[in-house]
């Protein structure tokens, strides 16, 4: 119903035009459609249970709360997608570093790999990697660019990785091992979360 580019624009609240992944501003039209949709569903549910137009109409008032609930769902979904995309980025970047490439060259290679995995140019991780490369091209450090990304992502896995990444860059630590370890950890968390969701869904239908 709403294009990904439009959704990305509505999600941006910062003056610099970058995405804050904890923010999603629902457009007026989108909000209206969500309220109407929720009102119809609530009316139908109310009528099935109460067989009363009056009570069903009262239940429709709860539809006003739906845009906020939907906004939180969109934010959560976007952050889950970003986590998975970040895992793929780490895998590609660690592969590039393992053959002797610099971090900067590795990011360029990782971006090319990600463009194959995610053909939509508006995919979050593609936009973030492109922004990081532009920043590096303007003489910003890799550490500062990743740190900015982590601040906007509001994701523990990314924040933890960036903290270790910055330390490794300063002390000469094993970046390849850090990236592989972080990628594996994220993958394990995703698998556990999916198993829990599958179990919960299964119990609902028992």
Regions found by a protein language model. Name each.
Residues 1-91, 190-198, 203-206:
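Hydrophobic alpha-helical signal-anchor/transmembrane segments
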């Amino acid at each position: 119903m709403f294009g990904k580019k439009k959704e990305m624009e509505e999600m941006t609240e910062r003056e610099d035009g970058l995405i804050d992944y904890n923010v999603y501003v629902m457009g007026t039209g989108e909000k209206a459609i969500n309220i109407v949709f929720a009102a119809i569903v609530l009316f139908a549910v109310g009528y099935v249970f109460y067989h009363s137009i009056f009570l069903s109409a009262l239940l429709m008032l709860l539809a006003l709360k739906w845009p906020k609930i939907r906004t939180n769902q969109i934010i959560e979904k976007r952050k889950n997608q970003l986590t998975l995309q970040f895992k793929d980025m780490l895998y590609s970047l660690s592969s590039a570093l393992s053959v002797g490439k610099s971090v900067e060259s590795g990011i360029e290679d990782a971006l090319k790999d990600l463009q194959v995995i995610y053909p939509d140019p508006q995919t979050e991780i593609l936009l973030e990697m492109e922004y990081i490369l532009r920043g590096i091209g303007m003489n910003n450090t890799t550490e500062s660019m990743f740190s900015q990304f982590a601040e906007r992502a509001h994701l523990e896995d990314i924040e933890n990785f960036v903290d270790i990444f910055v330390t490794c860059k300063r002390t000469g630590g094993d970046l390849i091992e850090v990236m592989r370890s972080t990628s594996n950890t994220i993958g394990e968390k995703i698998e556990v979360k999916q198993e829990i969701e599958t179990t919960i869904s299964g119990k609902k239908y028992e």
